[in-house]
Amino acid sequence: MKAQTAKDATTPRGQFRFLSASDWKDYELLDCGEGRKLERFGDYTFNRPDAQALWPPQSPVDTWRADGEFTGGDDEERGAWRFGGNPPPESWPVTWNGLTMETRCASFRHMGLFPEHSVHWRWAAEKIRNAGRPTRVLNLFGYTGAMSLACAQAGAEVVHLDASPKSIGYGRDNQELSNLNDRTIRWICDDALKFLRREERRGRVHRLRHDVPSL
């Protein structure tokens, strides 16, 4: 992707602001539109749904060539991955800003991380580095930990919370892959609201970051 930028654009459904992720050799948004997006993760390309891609694509969707495609109806839970002649392995590493994270063709059309969030990872890391004091971050609904790793790499003490034991396990693996075992990240599998109520009773204060899942 090109350097991080923000620009406004008008579509038939209104005006939007587009954020472009910064220099990321292992990820590339190749095309998007008509409710789908074509992306590259490392050496593999994927065609998967994206309800926010409301505009016409640069090339017709039926001409896209991908190593994997998530097919099915509008219901993500009923869809499935379909692979061509160059199927990806069960998981493979991608790097960003000195971090290494595993990606995979997961359920619900996901890839194990959200590359569009990298603008937020970079923003959070810059805030932590410029804080001039010790920083604690509570990352709710943290998934596989990209934000937590970026914050820990920048020097914060991180509490990572997710309700999925599998996601917590992937996050721990990503911490090891990124050589951040010397950084403080508490990996907690719990309900977010219950955890917050306990933290409030204990009088603990964090910088709060959350990405609430679709309900």
Please give the residue ranges for each predicted region.
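Conserved SAM-binding loop of SAM-dependent methyltransferases across substrates and taxa
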Residues: 144-156
